[in-house]
């Protein structure tokens, strides 16, 4: 477990949080390789969440692009509609092991809030979800589902009323309640041990994808593409391929209305080093070094920073990062829906858009895997404003 990735990561937190982080680190080290814990997690991932997910050859999309073979890792088929359940199940089982009776979470697109509400119901843990008021408005369906599972949803009215503000509130809660509460951070962000732990729970994506592509093609892919907000779905699929230097790894950030505007969420492409939410990483900042307002059509990609491992992988040039605009993401949303009968989440549509773009430039015997991190049901209301029939 990495305390830091190069200079990124660490624990930049108030003293009062150190005991809970130490307790969590100790518990995670104890259980992560414990056969009983692993068996229980595997049981729930398979029987409850629906793993393993298919690696689907998108034949129609491949033909339409006229280049590389495109495979989709179908995390959108999991219970709750996204990859988030992989991590929520792992952390909830850990919370139970250390005697916590309450769980809290932050959420942007509502997917992580939903998966946390689900595991709260499953394991009899009281759940409270913090969500920016702006996101509550644009993700009504997920908010309703969370409440249906018995979770309390708190609409955060401070700051930009989006994900970063929800994290601030959740951290405040945890400072006061950590004796009986576990904070299930939803992305590979935050103070150590969260980035390593979330990556480990999400790495099941890459482990499966590697096995599946070897079965399907007898070799590794040429490129893997995944969207990056905080960066958990991407680190989950990249992790298993980090050592395979011949595999190009591409993280796709939200370019919003354009990288030359101030309305985007591209923390790696346009951010600077800074400290927020307990970690040193790359963040979008204004001229005074304050955290800048972010923007993306997709609620899950408007975090103003990125997980510390991504900042490091960018620095050592192991992962290439690209930006996709709202317009390009909407086009990919529509294209995948029409050509394959699969409606992707707006977050995942950013990865699909970039995958489509590079597939055209590649040879027909080359292979791309796109991580389809979630499905688009939650985004239909947003998309209706842009795509009309």
Swiss-Prot record:
CDD domains per record: Trp-synth_B
Transmembrane segments: none
Top-level taxon: Archaea
Cofactor(s) annotated in UniProt: pyridoxal 5'-phosphate
Its EC number(s): 4.2.1.20
GO cellular-component term (any): cytoplasm
Chain positions found as N6-(pyridoxal phosphate)lysine: 84
HAMAP family assigned to the protein according to its UniProt record, in alphabetical order: Trp_synth_beta
Role noted for this protein: The beta subunit is responsible for the synthesis of L-tryptophan from indole and L-serine.
Protein name from the UniProt record: Tryptophan synthase beta chain
Organism of provenance: Methanococcus aeolicus (strain ATCC BAA-1280 / DSM 17508 / OCM 812 / Nankai-3)
Gene designation: trpB
């Amino acid at each position: 477990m990495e305390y830091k990735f190069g200079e990124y990561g660490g624990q930049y937190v108030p003293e009062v949080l150190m005991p809970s982080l130490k307790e969590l680190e100790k518990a995670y080290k104890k259980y992560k390789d414990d056969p009983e814990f692993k068996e229980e997690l595997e049981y729930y991932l398979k029987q409850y969440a629906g793993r393993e997910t298919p690696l689907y050859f998108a034949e129609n999309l491949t033909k339409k692009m006229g280049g590389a073979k495109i495979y989709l890792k179908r995390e959108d088929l999991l219970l709750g509609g996204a990859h988030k359940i992989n991590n929520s199940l792992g952390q909830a089982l850990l919370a139970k092991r250390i005697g916590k009776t309450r769980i809290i979470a932050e959420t942007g697109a509502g997917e992580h809030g939903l998966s946390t509400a689900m595991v709260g119901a499953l394991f009899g843990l009281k759940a409270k979800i913090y969500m920016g008021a702006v996101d509550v408005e644009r993700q009504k369906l997920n908010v309703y589902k969370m409440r249906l599972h018995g979770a309390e949803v708190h609409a955060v009215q401070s700051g930009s009323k989006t994900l970063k503000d929800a994290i601030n509130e959740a951290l405040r809660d945890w400072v006061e309640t950590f004796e009986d509460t576990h904070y299930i951070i939803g992305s590979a962000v935050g103070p150590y041990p969260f980035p390593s732990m979330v990556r480990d729970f999400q790495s099941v994506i890459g482990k499966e994808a590697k096995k599946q592509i070897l079965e399907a093609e007898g070799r590794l892919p040429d490129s893997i593409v995944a969207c990056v907000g905080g960066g958990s779905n991407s680190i989950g699929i990249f992790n298993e391929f980090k050592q395979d230097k011949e595999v190009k790894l591409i993280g796709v950030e939200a370019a919003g209305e354009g990288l030359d505007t101030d309305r985007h969420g591209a923390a790696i492409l346009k951010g600077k080093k800074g400290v927020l939410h307990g970690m040193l990483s790359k963040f979008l900042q204004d001229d005074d070094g304050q955290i800048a307002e972010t923007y993306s059509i997709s609620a899950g990609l408007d975090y103003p920073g990125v997980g510390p491992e991504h900042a490091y992988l960018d620095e050592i040039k192991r992962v290439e990062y690209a930006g996709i605009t709202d317009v390009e993401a909407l086009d990919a949303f529509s294209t995948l829906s029409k050509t394959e009968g699969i409606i992707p989440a707006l977050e995942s549509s950013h990865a699909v858009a970039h995958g489509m773009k590079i597939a055209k430039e590649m040879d027909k015997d080359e292979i791309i895997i796109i991580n389809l991190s979630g499905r688009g049901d939650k985004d239909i209301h947003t998309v209706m404003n842009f795509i009309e029939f």
